[in-house]
Amino acid sequence: MPMARVNYAYKPEDETKAAKAMGYEMPISFKHAVEICRAIRGKKIEEARKLLEDVVEMKRAIPFKRHKKKVAHRRGLEKWYAGRYPQKAAKYVLKVLRNLEANAEYKGLDVENLVIVHAQAQKGRVIERYMPRAFGRATPRFQQLTTVELVAEVR
């Protein structure tokens, strides 16, 4: 089945000074992806990569600002209290970030001066599965897919 053409939610003012990358329908938590995108937005690519690598190694936590109910306090968070280590989502967003960096190099942009101006997570399709149980019952096991898009511009 061919993949549909997906547009970006953000349009840069000057396409020649911007690089884009998208991870389409990845099997990660939408809530975790939203919080990771908020954490890396406004950062340089190198800073964002270091943050995500630290999250995967459980050295730094991602502040959870929207989805924060019953989330424990974490040390090392600046100006916030609740946080988690969303390792799986961080690995997938890190792949998209590396793709963004490769796209910028291909366009001939200065990677050291690129700032992530747009980082967004969107809900994708839901894969519906059912697990058979005893006495003829079935339990739904739905999987929400997530699309992550990143845009960086030279600043």
From Swiss-Prot:
Gene Ontology CC annotations of this record: cytosolic large ribosomal subunit
What does the UniProt keyword field contain?
A: Ribonucleoprotein, Ribosomal protein, RNA-binding, rRNA-binding
One GO biological process this protein is involved in is:
cytoplasmic translation
Q: Does the keyword Nucleotide-binding apply?
A: no
Q: What's a single GO MF annotation on this record?
A: structural constituent of ribosome
Taking the record's annotation, the residue ranges forming a coiled coil are none
- What Pfam families is this protein classified in? Ribosomal_L22
Is Aminoacyl-tRNA synthetase tagged as a keyword?
Answer: no
Please describe the quaternary structure of this protein.
Answer: Part of the 50S ribosomal subunit.
Looking up PANTHER family in the UniProt record yields: 60S RIBOSOMAL PROTEIN L17 (PTHR11593:SF10)
Function, as annotated, reads: This protein binds specifically to 23S rRNA. It makes multiple contacts with different domains of the 23S rRNA in the assembled 50S subunit and ribosome.
Q: So what family is this one in?
A: Belongs to the universal ribosomal protein uL22 family.
Q: What is this protein called?
A: Large ribosomal subunit protein uL22
The organism encoding this protein is Archaeoglobus fulgidus (strain ATCC 49558 / DSM 4304 / JCM 9628 / NBRC 100126 / VC-16)
Phylogenetic classification of the source organism = Archaea, Methanobacteriati, Methanobacteriota, Archaeoglobi, Archaeoglobales
The gene name reads rpl22
